């Protein structure tokens, strides 16, 4: 089970804390072009600021958050859940459950965001118009084996990967001959 956690302080501090407890975590990064002193450079920056994805059971996450709460002694919490605002808990309808992400969706997201390409961008559902909602798999190039929906973004055909409702990431341009229809098995 994968939980997404929102971190409040410095990303390296939160990641180090989770890893010190022996838990697996992932921070999605992006490669961005910047101009510094007239020179074009590629820098690494968080793709989704304040997000740290933790692969753990409910008990492990609860234990981690409890330890952080005890050690912070009333200071701002270093980590907290990111809550799923699309559903309510059955035992308490006024509260939202922590966001959990399916393993296959997380694997696909990690595969996409691990590629060193500055044209990978986070997007929202408002700017995407799926082309017939076609689900495809990329068959060639940097994004090979990434699957998602075809979309036209910034005037280019791209493949969009949805991690959870409202959290989408788009590849760089994908030519038509580098993708095929994806049939879920």
Predicted regions and their residues:
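Short beta-strand-centered aromatic/proline hotspots
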Residues: 144-153
């Amino acid at each position: 089970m994968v939980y997404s956690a929102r971190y409040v302080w410095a990303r390296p501090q939160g990641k180090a804390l989770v890893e010190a407890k022996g838990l697996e975590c992932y921070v999605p990064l992006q490669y961005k072009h910047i101009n510094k002193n007239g020179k074009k450079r590629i820098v690494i920056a968080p793709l989704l600021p304040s997000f740290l994805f933790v692969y753990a059971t409910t008990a492990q996450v609860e234990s981690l958050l409890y330890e952080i709460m005890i050690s912070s002694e009333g200071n701002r919490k270093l980590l907290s859940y990111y809550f799923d605002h699309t559903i309510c808990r059955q035992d308490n309808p006024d509260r939202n459950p922590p966001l959990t992400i399916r393993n296959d969706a997380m694997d696909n997201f990690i595969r996409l965001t691990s590629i060193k390409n500055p044209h990978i961008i986070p997007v929202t559902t408002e700017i995407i118009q799926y082309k017939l909602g076609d689900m495809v798999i990329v068959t060639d190039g940097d994004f090979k084996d990434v699957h998602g929906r075809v979309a036209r973004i910034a005037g280019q055909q791209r493949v969009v990967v949805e991690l959870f409702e409202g959290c989408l990431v788009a590849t760089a341009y994908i030519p038509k001959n580098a993708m095929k229809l994806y049939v879920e098995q």
